[in-house]
């Protein structure tokens, strides 16, 4: 670390170069300090030594500034990549500038950053009067009992702020100003599949090709999307939907123009073309999504509050004396008991139990969800009426026990209104009930008016591990039609018409058996007015595992109202891992028996291969007792950085088929065009300029292209996403200061994760000046050829050694060890043509 001519510290980015040599320097200094303390006549209470001892022992120039190394915990000021903790909870990771204040490193944090952390700035006039960009190095000067501390070895910055001056924010809360709208871009997600089919006894073959395209464009907060398909069977392109969308942060909502679907919690959903404003729960922290009760209590002192469910701690916090409210519990099960433990400062504990239960429609206390839709109904059959309409819905959590909801649909020949409530019965579970009234003009002078009733019940039996849900959904009177049924109503030539639903019953039970596995039962039945019979589906199953072998037994029953026949299938599946003999593979056996007494047997071998397991394969052979037919299948899929390729071959007694496919994405962005795997909704552009073939951790097959770019095809919107590069996959000529970036994309965004790379060589220089070694503590800086080049500096260690990475084949290095003109020099270097096996060049360099 050096000083300029004015006596100020020169700051620079601290990188791996410093880490490589700082430890030997500190060991050397500590050794000298120990010797000095042993021979000194005075004893000090802290680790301190006279820096002049270094001059006498090592011949250092008297003007070199090494005062920052005097104390054991002292490090040079500069910019460090640190984990940031607020009151012992990690809130961020990033670059922070540090300066020397009172002989220790102190962070420079802007006032607006404290506000973003949740500090109530308005409580402190001296703070609120400052501009938002004001850099604060000692927050304790403004807020009593506030402080910061930096653990250099752990690269951890701890900020302590009294809880009383923090605004109440939910856990995992991400401020909206951190949400990133992303880059302007164009994108295409494609999925191509084709097949060649041969039938025995018929000449030639038939070919089928299908292309699925999901294309779009991003500009600021706006997202334009289109979904189109092409089929060779009818040789026709079809545009299925097009819409323009953006988020409205202040309303926690999405605004959509074009083709979309109405939300379905209250009314059955249907497709429309128009405009919609709808709540988006993704904008809420995980701790505020779904349903969880609000906990209220009173603390007599500074107390610890612990909340347990089923004996496990699910929440813990500290509160000040007086009433407290906890409203950011994560949703767990649909019902149960919460044990609340308040531990006072003197060790006394107060315990209480709060039961809760929730059906899917229920919201947290004071939570609001809404939707507003204007548009034109889109008939899926293209034979129904397509009127203009308006639909509005609202749901509100009144308390822990009550949620109310309602909505309306208005059209020229149809209107309906729905009102309902969800109610918690505590230990008895929870239920919801609503009524919908509708009046419709089905055809000219044909009017219909009726009601529909919906009931839903949910209960978790914690003691037995049973989850039980029953929904009497819905019972409708003869003249009730929902909006879709009314528009699809059609009188045929024989005076019959499309029947409307009469009732629908659903049942779902899931039972855990502990180590013995689990069972489930799912049942569904629906019938219609003016139509005999009913539609019924039943499925049940049991699953368990023993010695890593998985067993599954399933039964299904299905019946349509238009027929008296039903289908029943019983199946047994056994999956055996083959890791001992073949890595990442397993064998399966399946036995299936149908009501028609057709029995089939299937054995298969499945697995993954290659270094990153991005090649999957499957081999199957089956036998059916019906006509003694046999068949088989072999298929494989490769998942690469630029897309996914699959192929397969099927055969049976009468036919053969060869199928193939290609899936992937193409993204055009401000830095060029990048090919990728199949695209999701929210994307990340990895930019490691010039670093080819660098893998992205936790994403199979994804690596940077020849320019250093890659697309991460899916990310969580409005959440912190950590994008990390695999440093072991970097070339010898690639160096990077920070291998992890944190981004917070909005829905549909292409967000940039920009990694600062240095492309060049690694060099260890043995520096000398006028026949003497360059003193340790000096700085060696690569002279920039362009203003856009990143700074590249290091500290000279003992023996005059300087390590630099990411430097070009030839160049100039500026060395400085004091604030006098005579205490600097420059060295021109040229690396040999032959690259050493270690990848590290070692050169002797005379500095002039």
Pin down the residues of each PLM region.
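Post-signal-peptide, soluble extracytosolic/periplasmic N-terminal scaffold domains
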Residues: 4, 44-289, 595-667
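Short, ordered, surface-exposed loop/turn motifs in non-cytosolic proteins
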Residues: 76-98, 690-700, 771-786
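Residues that define the transmembrane beta-barrel architecture of outer-membrane proteins
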Residues: 184, 205-211, 236-240, 291, ...
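Outer-membrane beta-barrel translocator/channel fold
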Residues: 259-271, 432-503, 553-573, 591-600, ...
């Amino acid at each position: 670390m050096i000083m300029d001519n004015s006596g100020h510290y020169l700051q620079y980015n601290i990188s791996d170069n410093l880490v490589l040599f700082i430890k030997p320097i500190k060991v050397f200094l500590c050794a000298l300090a120990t010797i000095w303390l042993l021979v000194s006549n005075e004893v000090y209470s802290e680790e301190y030594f006279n820096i002049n001892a270094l001059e006498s022992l090592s011949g250092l120039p008297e003007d070199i500034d090494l005062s920052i190394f005097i104390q054991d915990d002292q490090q040079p000021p500069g910019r460090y990549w640190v984990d940031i903790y607020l009151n012992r909870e990690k809130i961020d990771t990033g670059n922070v500038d540090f300066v020397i204040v009172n002989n220790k490193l102190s962070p420079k944090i802007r006032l607006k950053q404290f506000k973003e952390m949740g500090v109530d700035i308005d409580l402190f006039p001296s703070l609120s009067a400052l501009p938002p960009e004001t850099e604060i190095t000692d927050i304790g000067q403004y807020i009593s009992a506030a402080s910061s501390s930096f653990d250099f070895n752990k690269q951890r910055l701890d900020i302590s702020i009294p809880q009383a001056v923090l605004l109440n924010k939910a856990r995992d809360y991400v401020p909206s100003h951190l949400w990133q709208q992303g880059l302007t871009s164009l994108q295409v997600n494609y999925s191509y599949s084709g097949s060649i089919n041969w039938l025995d006894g018929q000449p030639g073959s038939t070919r089928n090709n299908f292309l699925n395209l999901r294309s779009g464009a991003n500009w600021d907060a706006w997202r334009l999307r289109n979904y189109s398909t092409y089929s060779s069977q009818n040789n026709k392109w079809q545009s299925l939907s097009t819409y323009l969308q953006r988020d409205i942060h202040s309303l926690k909502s999405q605004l959509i123009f074009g083709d979309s679907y109405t939300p379905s919690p209250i009314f059955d959903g249907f497709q429309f073309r128009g405009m919609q404003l709808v709540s988006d729960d993704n904008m809420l922290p995980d701790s505020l999504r779904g349903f969880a009760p609000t906990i209220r209590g009173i603390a007599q002192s500074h107390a610890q509050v612990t909340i347990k469910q089923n004996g496990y701690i699910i929440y813990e916090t500290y509160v000040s004396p007086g009433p407290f409210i906890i409203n950011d519990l994560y949703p767990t099960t649909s019902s149960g008991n919460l044990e609340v433990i308040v531990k006072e400062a003197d060790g006394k504990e107060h315990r209480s139990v709060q039961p809760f239960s929730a059906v899917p429609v229920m919201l947290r206390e004071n939570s609001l969800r809404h939707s507003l839709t204007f548009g034109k109904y889109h008939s899926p059959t293209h034979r129904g009426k397509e009127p203009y309409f308006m639909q509005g819905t609202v749901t509100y959590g009144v308390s822990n026990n009550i949620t109310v909801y309602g909505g309306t649909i208005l059209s020229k020949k149809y209107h309906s209104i729905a009102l309902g409530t969800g109610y918690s019965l505590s230990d008895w579970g929870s239920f919801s009930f609503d009524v919908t009234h509708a009046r419709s003009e089905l055809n000219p002078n044909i009017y219909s008016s009726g009601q529909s009733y919906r009931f839903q019940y949910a209960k978790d039996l914690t003691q037995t591990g049973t989850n039980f849900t029953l929904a009497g959904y819905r019972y409708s009177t003869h003249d009730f039609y929902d909006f879709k049924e009314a528009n699809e109503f059609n009188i045929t030539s024989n005076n019959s018409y499309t029947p409307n639903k009469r009732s629908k019953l659903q049942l779902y039970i899931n039972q855990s058996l502990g180590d013995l596995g689990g069972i489930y039962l799912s049942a569904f039945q629906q019938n219609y007015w003016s139509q005999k019979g009913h539609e019924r589906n039943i499925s049940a199953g049991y699953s368990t595992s023993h010695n890593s072998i998985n067993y599954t037994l399933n039964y299904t029953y299905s019946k349509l109202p238009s027929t008296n026949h039903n289908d029943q299938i019983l199946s047994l599946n056994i999956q055996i891992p083959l890791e001992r003999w073949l890595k990442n593979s397993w064998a399966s056996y399946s036995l299936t028996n149908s009501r028609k007494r057709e029995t089939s047997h299937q054995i298969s071998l499945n697995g993954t291969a290659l270094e990153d397991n991005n090649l999957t394969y499957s081999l199957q052979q089956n036998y059916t007792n019906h006509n003694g037919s046999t068949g088989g299948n072999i298929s494989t899929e490769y998942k690469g950085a630029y897309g996914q390729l699959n192929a397969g071959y099927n055969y049976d007694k009468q036919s053969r088929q060869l199928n193939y496919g290609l899936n992937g994405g193409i993204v055009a962005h401000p830095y060029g065009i990048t090919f990728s795997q199949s695209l999701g909704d929210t994307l990340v552009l990895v930019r490691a300029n010039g670093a080819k073939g660098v893998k992205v951790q936790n994403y199979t097959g994804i690596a940077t292209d020849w320019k250093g770019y890659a697309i991460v095809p899916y990310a969580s919107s409005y959440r912190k996403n950590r994008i990390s590069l695999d440093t072991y996959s970097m070339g010898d000529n690639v160096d990077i200061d920070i291998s992890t970036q944190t981004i917070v994309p909005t829905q549909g965004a292409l967000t940039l994760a920009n990694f600062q790379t240095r492309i060049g060589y690694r060099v260890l220089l043995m520096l000398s000046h006028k026949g003497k070694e360059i003193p340790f503590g000096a700085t060696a800086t690569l002279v920039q050829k362009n203003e856009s080049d990143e700074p590249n500096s290091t500290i000279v260690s003992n023996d005059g050694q300087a390590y630099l990475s990411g430097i070009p084949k030839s160049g100039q290095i500026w060395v400085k060890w004091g604030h006098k003109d005579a205490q600097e020099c420059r060295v021109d270097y040229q690396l040999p043509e032959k690259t050493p096996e270690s990848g590290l060049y070692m050169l002797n360099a005379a500095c002039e």
